A protein has these predicted regions:
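Active-site gating/metal-coordination segments in enzymes
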Residues: 68, 74-201
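Short, conserved clusters of charged catalytic residues that mark active-site
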Residues: 53-57, 153, 157, 201-204, ...
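Short, basic, glycine/proline-bearing loop/turn elements
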Residues: 40-47, 143-144, 250-257
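Acidic-and-aromatic substrate-binding clefts and catalytic sites of carbohydrate-active enzymes
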Residues: 48-53, 79-80, 117-123, 146-153, ...
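Mid-to-C-terminal alpha-helical segments outside catalytic/metal-binding sites
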Residues: 2-23, 29-69, 96-104, 125-129, ...
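Hydrophobic faces of well-ordered beta-strands that scaffold small-molecule active sites
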Residues: 21-25, 70-72, 110-113, 139-141, ...
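H/E-rich (His + Asp/Glu) clusters that bind or coordinate divalent metals
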Residues: 6, 179, 186-205, 217-332
Length: 332
């Protein structure tokens, strides 16, 4: 896997990412930021602040590190602020503005649309609008909505729609409802996010949701969170489900795609490669929650650790196969 030469990824000082497609990139609209502030969410999930974001700064950052395309999504805590009508309108706002960014900057941005869950009828309508009218590249879903995880039968109509559309779904963690009892005062992205991702994916598998809907391509963040370590444990316990659907946990995990946002070396990536193969790996920055200097600092050792063919697949080859609109590189 490794190529540790000093010039493994080009000359010294060159952007480390060489045309990467970033599947884990976030954005804010003015309306979303105002809704968060009005709701008192100024330190989302215990982070220090709502990070700054604007298209010009994002593009400058992308050019500096070598990202060709950023697939934009709304991070935790999402858009569930205010009345159901307000949430529906906020979903339309972030999706409309995201689609406009894609149109205004061809090849530089993609859109993973937000849905006003847990309002299922409105979410079905917004998913159709985003995919059909706005040309969204996929849908961003959080691990749960008001405590209902994605394997819940509540979401079956949505999963059917996404399966029929062969949609790409980017899964993003959010704080579990019990976070006040479990986070121990630490920022929730440190411990709660990885375990909520693990919980959500396990539920998708153990409920049979993943197997019932093979047309959905799920992207799991942060190198699979705790799944590479817990996969065998979950698989054995699954055999004890007397009343659950028959599942093959390891086979189902092998169908997923995994982004490498965050701290993947030296331990997480080797563990993940015991669970899946390199053609299921995707690059993710988690910008702007991961600031620009940290994106570059994490990217350089990652790309230098990979053989050239694996590096190409990770940075853009696998993403081009996953997202139809991106199958051809952007014209210079």
């Amino acid at each position: 896997m490794t190529d540790n030469s000093a010039t493994a990824n080009g000359p010294a000082g060159a952007p480390p990412l060489h045309g990467a497609i970033d599947v884990h990139a976030h954005f804010f609209t003015a309306r979303l930021r105002a809704a968060m502030q009005d709701a008192g969410v100024t330190r989302p999930d215990g982070m220090p602040a709502i990070p700054d974001w604007d298209p010009k700064s994002a593009l400058r950052h992308m050019d500096e590190v070598g990202i060709e395309t950023a697939m934009l999504s709304v991070s935790s805590p999402g858009i569930d602020f205010g009345t159901p009508d307000a949430v529906r309108e906020l979903a339309r706002n972030v999706n409309d503005e995201g689609a406009e960014l894609v149109r205004t900057h061809p090849g530089r941005f993609g859109l993973m649309a937000s849905l006003p869950l847990p309002d299922l009828p409105a979410s079905l309508a917004e998913a159709e609008r985003a995919l059909d009218d706005l040309g969204a590249d996929g849908i961003a879903l959080h691990t749960h909505y008001q405590g209902h995880y994605l394997g819940d039968p509540l979401y079956e109509p949505l999963m059917e729609l996404l399966d029929d559309r062969r949609a790409v779904v980017f899964l993003h963690p959010t704080s579990p409802q019990c976070w006040k009892d479990t986070s121990l005062g630490y920022p929730r992205p440190m411990i709660e996010f990885p375990f909520d991702t693990t919980r959500a994916v396990a539920h998708l598998i153990l409920s049979g949701t993943l197997r019932r809907h093979p047309g959905i391509s799920f992207v799991i963040p942060h190198a699979g969170a705790a799944l590479p370590v817990l996969a065998d444990r979950i698989a054995v316990f699954a055999l004890m489900q007397a009343d659950g659907p028959p599942v093959d946990v390891l086979a189902d995990l092998a169908t997923l795609h995994f982004d490498l946002a965050g701290f993947t070396l030296p331990r997480a990536l080797p563990a993940l490669l015991n669970l899946t193969d390199t053609r299921h790996l995707l690059y993710g920055s988690d910008f702007p929650f991961t600031p620009d200097w940290a994106v570059e600092g994490l990217a350089r050792p990652l790309v230098d650790a990979l053989d050239p063919a694996v590096r190409t697949d990770l940075l853009h080859g696998n993403a081009r196969r996953l997202f139809p609109r991106l199958r051809e590189p952007r014209s210079a």
